[in-house]
Amino acid sequence: DPIPLDEVKTVGRALGASINDVLLSCVGGALASYLRDKGDDTDGVTLRALVPVNLRPMERAYKLGNQFGLVFLELPIGMENPVARLYAVRENLRSLRGSYQPVLALGILAAMGAGPKLLQDTLLAILARNASAVMTNVPEPQQPLWLAAARIAGLLLWVPQSGDDGVG
């Protein structure tokens, strides 16, 4: 069942965490539960997830186009305590956002887009080899959407996968 956004915000406010922190921590807990149900030992295990970081300055928030970098988040799926896991995710993300990783990734993505296909394929393979999952969130529209005078009843969003990434 979906988790109401208001509940996610309440948890985040109470524990000093962002919506992303809470959601990534929940996904980590769900993945750990799934793996344990399949017989895997998750004690002390981390899962490396590729997570986008917004690099667009607030004064340009209205402009079209993407301006994001990527970071490799160590998601502590081996932490059973959900509050401890949330704090670990929060600290990991804060550290990564302030690092060189997002800006470097933005530069690599720009080079990939401007370079030949061989360069694109090589760099994409390197990125894909270093993560087991790609995770992001996209807020749902705050008002109904219409296409050709027909109201859109629902949206299906997915994260582009590459290589052997198993989760998106």
Set out the residue ranges of the language-model regions.
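Gly/Ser/Thr-rich phosphate-binding loops and adjoining beta-strand/alpha-helix segments
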Residues: D1-V53
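Helical lid/core segments from catalytic subdomains that handle acyl or acyl-like groups
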Residues: E7, P57, A61-P141
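Extended hydrophobic-aromatic, low-complexity segments
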Residues: D21-V22, L35, G98, P144-L147
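Glycine-rich, charged/polar anion/phosphate-binding loops
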Residues: R36-D37, L55-M58, K117-T122, G154-L155, ...
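A structural signal for short secondary-structure junctions
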Residues: T42-V45, G65, A125-R129, P160-D165
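Solvent-exposed, non-transmembrane amphipathic alpha-helical segments
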Residues: D43, L47, V51, L55, ...
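Low-complexity, glycine/alanine/valine/leucine- and proline-rich hydrophobic stretches
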Residues: R129-G168
